[in-house]
Regions:
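Short loop/turn motifs that connect adjacent beta-strands in outer-membrane beta-barrel proteins
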Residues: 186-191, 272-279, 334-335, 389-393, ...
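Transmembrane beta-barrel wall of Gram-negative outer-membrane proteins
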Residues: 246-353, 375-382, 388-389, 580
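Periplasm-facing N-terminal accessory domains of Gram-negative outer-membrane beta-barrel systems
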Residues: 1-62
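Flexible glycine-rich, low-complexity coil/linker segments exposed to the extracellular/periplasmic environment
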Residues: 204-256, 423-430, 474, 479, ...
Length: 585
């Protein structure tokens, strides 16, 4: 039985007559323990408590910053040794930004070209670099150095940080901008979120939408039967005469554009395991996008200004985006943390185009073609942060990325308009064709960094980084010889009446496979790097960041010449990269 005294120390305890043990406690005072106290009616007991002279030598408060908000990111900019700009998830949500590409556009000095290439101070795509949680990620597009930034939806992003200056801790392959995408982690309370949206574009919703025959949905990546690639040319020609080679035709159907749909499910949970903290976060989102473009035009010019060809076209694009994020964190011994992050993204774009115009020889041509691009990224990361007292800390991280770019079953049929009649265009066999191409890239990265703090705000940092990248590409073409085929054509969308298996079997159509050695290559790149850098205040308001990086780089590519001769090209370099950045507060 017990009672709490009021602010003046008065108390009343109702007990029966008898002998009791009484304990008195108060914060900041020594406990009082009285044994064998005899209590009768209206007994008065007063206690004089002595102050507890013990004092806390140090109080440590451990917390994790939530780097999604503007205020936290502003503090990061102020403390940063480099000139950086950043954009957090909360600001992206307020501004209605749906992916990283749209977010980067909001940062001063950066623009995105029509082809999706990043432009920084007039410098193109190959002058910049992209990292995910500080580790490099490869591009699935061989034409671009940077991965398409619209592959990262805002729902999986904690913040975007852009640095336009060089730092010795980063790979020395950029002079434009370093874009780091930080994925979300659970640093707050438990949550479960479900979002759903629907919409449409004024020039698309409810309008006619054309689509060439497709093998399944955009959730699936169509593939070519491997035996069609491996068999000899003689065996292929015989096989093609009597067997259906592809799961699709050149037939075009017309539908009505439906509303676009999207949704995201996310959850976060924090709990203790063996007295240590564990955090879990997961998120998956799916969205689709429909886009039509009517009466557009394209013209190709020579350097002299002469027109090579000019076409008007209508295009119909269907895009599917999938992104998934998983994060697992484990904190122990107060100042140590290890984590695992998984990120998956898939962008599939299917575009049908009908174009009509004239070529260099004044042929009046009509083209019906379909292109499907499927980009995917799978990234696994592990990381650890360890603090040893107030001066030393050790950070390590590693990642494995697998990116792919597939162009399955690109198809084209060309027609010519002559004397108000539409005929098959047979100037060369490339006018009616199919193409299958795939590019796969695997990348391993490891990083180890140790830091030593001295003085009030000075720091010395040293690290080692390793990167190994391998890329494989292969393309196969199938050309349709239509010289024996002369159908009556009234509708270019209806091709099943003449581009069919019956005409292949009777010899009116011949399908040729072109799989030349020059249509494939294998490449690789290995980098070993070490660096040392310091952040030093010579005087209070002046911060000097001085560093040097040494890289051993080996690059190679195995390819074939037009004549089919195997070649290897190598580039081995040892480079020294100094850096100096100063900041005056």
């Amino acid at each position: 039985q017990g009672v709490v005294a009021d602010i003046d120390g008065n108390y009343t305890l109702n007990v029966n007559d008898g002998t009791y043990t009484i304990t008195v406690r108060y914060i900041g005072y020594k406990d009082i323990l009285l044994n064998s106290i005899k209590v009768k009616a209206e007994t008065l007991l007063n206690f004089e408590m002595e102050s507890d002279a013990q004092a806390l030598g140090e109080v440590s408060v451990v917390a994790k910053k939530n780097l999604e908000g503007e205020r936290a990111l502003q503090m990061e900019r102020q403390k940063a040794t480099l000139a950086i700009e950043n954009l957090g998830a909360k600001e992206m949500s307020i501004k209605g930004i749906s992916n990283v590409e749209e977010g980067v556009k909001k940062i001063t000095g950066i623009s995105i070209a029509s082809a999706g290439q990043l432009i920084v101070r007039g410098l193109g795509d190959r002058y910049s670099t992209t990292t995910l949680n500080g580790l490099p990620i490869a591009s699935p597009n061989p034409d671009n150095k940077l991965i398409p930034l619209d592959i990262f939806p805002a729902s999986t992003v904690q913040n975007i940080t852009v640095s336009k200056v060089y730092d010795a801790s980063a790979f020395a392959d950029y002079s434009g901008a370093h874009i780091d995408i930080s994925t979300k982690e659970n640093v707050g309370s438990d949550f479960l979120s479900i979002n759903f949206n629907a919409g449409g574009k004024f020039n698309t919703l409810g309008k006619d939408f054309y689509r060439m025959d497709r093998d399944g949905s955009l959730f699936k990546t169509p593939s070519l039967d491997q035996k069609l690639i491996d068999m000899s040319l003689t065996d292929f020609e015989e096989y093609a005469r009597h067997n259906r080679l592809f799961n699709t035709s050149f037939q075009v159907s017309k539908k009505t554009a439906l509303p676009e749909f999207g949704g995201n499910i996310g959850f976060g949970k924090r709990f203790t395991l063996g007295g240590n903290e564990v955090s879990v976060l997961g998120s998956i989102g799916v969205s689709n996008d429909l886009q039509t473009m009517d009466n557009a035009s394209i013209r190709t010019l020579e350097a002299t200004g002469n027109t090579l060809n000019e076409f008007n076209y209508d295009s119909y694009s269907n895009e599917l985006k999938i992104a998934a994020l998983g994060n697992l964190g484990y904190s122990f011994r107060t100042s140590d943390h290890i984590g695992y992050t998984f990120f998956y993204a898939r962008n599939a774009i299917d575009t049908y185009m009908r174009r009509e115009g004239v070529d260099y020889e004044d042929h009046h041509l009509i083209g019906s073609n379909n292109v499907t691009h499927i980009y995917s990224l799978q990234n696994h990361q592990v990381n650890g942060k360890h603090y040893f007292g107030k001066q030393w800390d050790l950070n390590w991280s590693g990642s494995y990325s697998k990116t792919s770019s597939d162009e399955p079953d690109r198809r084209q049929v060309m027609f010519i308009r002559e004397d108000d009649q539409i005929k098959l265009f047979k100037l060369n066999r490339q006018e009616t064709m199919r193409y299958f191409g795939s590019l796969n890239e695997d990348e391993w990265v490891g990083d180890l960094t140790a830091s030593y703090r001295f003085g009030d705000n000075n720091k010395l940092q040293a690290g080692f980084t390793y990167k190994d990248k391998n890329r494989d590409y292969m393309g196969t073409r199938f050309y349709y010889n239509l010289n024996k085929l002369n159908p009556t054509i009234t509708d270019i969308y209806d091709t099943d009446s003449f581009l069919n298996m019956e005409n292949v079997e009777n010899g009116s159509i011949t399908i040729d496979r072109k799989k030349q050695p020059k249509d494939s290559y294998t490449a690789g790149n290995s980098i070993y790097a070490g660096y040392i850098a310091t952040e030093y205040y010579p005087v209070a308001p002046l911060l000097v960041n001085l560093g040097v990086r040494y890289e051993i780089s080996k690059q190679w590519v195995d390819y074939y010449t037009d004549g089919g001769k195997a070649e290897r090209s190598e580039l081995n370099k040892n480079d020294l990269f100094p850096s100096l950045n100063m900041k005056y507060y």
